[in-house]
């Protein structure tokens, strides 16, 4: 028996089935393309973070004496404002083994969480992902000079100076952590806290990826608040470091918002995507539109995504 569907008037129309099949195949190809693009974006983020690590270690390492002097000054400044809460917070957490295990794991896995948030934004809100990606690049670049201008020893190194913090990632964890202990790269880069800076970016990706009922925004705020608790409890950052990371993220978001619509490499990249979209088997794929900070452009991007 021939297979097919009926068209208008109940007449058999094999073309209807063929057309629907083509639509489904095109949708599948678009989905596969987006998954591949998301994987490529994770690779890009990995490369940026690796370059950041190398630059921070190579060009922005400062003498330990200056870093400890700055830490003592910062503790005094915080004390004058009643903000030296890190040691009391850690002492409370140390009474609960399960909580220490939780914060150690949360701290250690913050980069995988960043990549996951990026993938969600790539899949569900690619235009929003691109805008926030600009902020990610900006906050990463803005952080580097601060490590040379204001090297800062983290709380976990301050026990010899009368502040008996515990390095929980080394002392109370079975898994070694490259970011903890004197063997890691540039140990005097506590200010600003890039755990907070990059977690702010992750929170924005969640917000654009899951807008319904503001679920993404709520999850992002929860993630950000948890990270603030974690970096203090593990002895890695002071309150001022947290505020510095948040301030730097806010500046980066403002830069991303006001950047021009088309950056120098945008046109060339879109030509490549346009060429790929015209290849056989990739029909229906289009270059992703560029997003600037204007509300009109954002509305146009959302309309284009709904129509895709």
Residue ranges and their predicted role:
Residues 4-113, 280, 285-287:
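N-terminal transmembrane-helix/juxtamembrane module of multi-pass inner/ER membrane proteins
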Residues 41-44, 102-105, 109-112, 131-138, ...:
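Alpha-helical transmembrane segments of integral membrane proteins
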Residues 41-50, 136, 140, 144, ...:
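Alpha-helical transmembrane spans of integral membrane proteins, capturing the lipid-embedded, hydrophobic core
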Residues 50, 140-149, 222-233:
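Aromatic-anchored segments of alpha-helical transmembrane domains
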Residues 56, 63-72, 123-216, 260-297, ...:
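Membrane-interface loops
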Residues 105-120, 195-203:
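Hydrophobic alpha-helical transmembrane segments
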Residues 154-158, 190, 226-252:
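Interfacial helix-loop-helix junctions of multi-pass membrane proteins
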Residues 214-218, 228, 247-263:
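Hydrophobic alpha-helical segments of polytopic membrane proteins
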């Amino acid at each position: 028996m021939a297979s097919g569907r009926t068209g208008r008037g109940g007449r058999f129309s094999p073309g209807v089935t063929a057309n629907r099949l083509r639509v489904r195949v095109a949708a599948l190809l678009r989905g596969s393309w987006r998954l591949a693009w998301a994987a490529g974006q994770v690779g890009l983020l990995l490369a940026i973070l690796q370059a950041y690590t190398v630059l921070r270690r190579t060009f922005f390492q400062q003498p330990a004496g200056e870093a400890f002097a700055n830490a003592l000054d910062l503790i005094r400044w915080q004390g004058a404002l009643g903000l030296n809460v890190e040691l009391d917070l850690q002492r409370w957490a140390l009474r609960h083994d399960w909580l220490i295990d939780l914060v150690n794991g949360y701290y250690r896995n913050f980069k995988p969480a960043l990549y996951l948030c990026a993938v969600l934004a790539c899949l569900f809100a690619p235009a929003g992902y691109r805008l926030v990606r600009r902020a990610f690049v900006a906050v990463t670049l803005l952080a580097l000079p601060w490590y040379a201008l204001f090297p800062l020893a983290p709380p976990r190194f301050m026990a010899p100076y009368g502040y008996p913090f515990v390095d929980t990632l080394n002392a109370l964890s079975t898994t070694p952590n490259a970011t903890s202990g004197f063997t890691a790269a540039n140990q005097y880069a506590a200010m600003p806290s890039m755990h907070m800076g990059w977690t702010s970016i992750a929170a924005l990706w969640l917000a654009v990826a899951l807008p319904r009922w503001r679920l993404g925004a709520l999850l992002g705020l929860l993630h950000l608040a948890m990270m603030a608790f974690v970096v203090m409890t593990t002895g890695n950052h002071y309150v001022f470091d947290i505020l510095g990371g948040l301030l730097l993220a806010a500046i980066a978001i403002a830069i991303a918002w006001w950047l021009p619509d088309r950056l120098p490499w945008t046109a060339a990249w879109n030509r490549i995507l346009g060429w790929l979209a015209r290849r056989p088997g990739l029909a229906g794929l289009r270059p992703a539109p560029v997003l600037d900070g204007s509300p009109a452009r954002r509305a146009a991007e959302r309309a284009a995504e709904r129509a895709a």
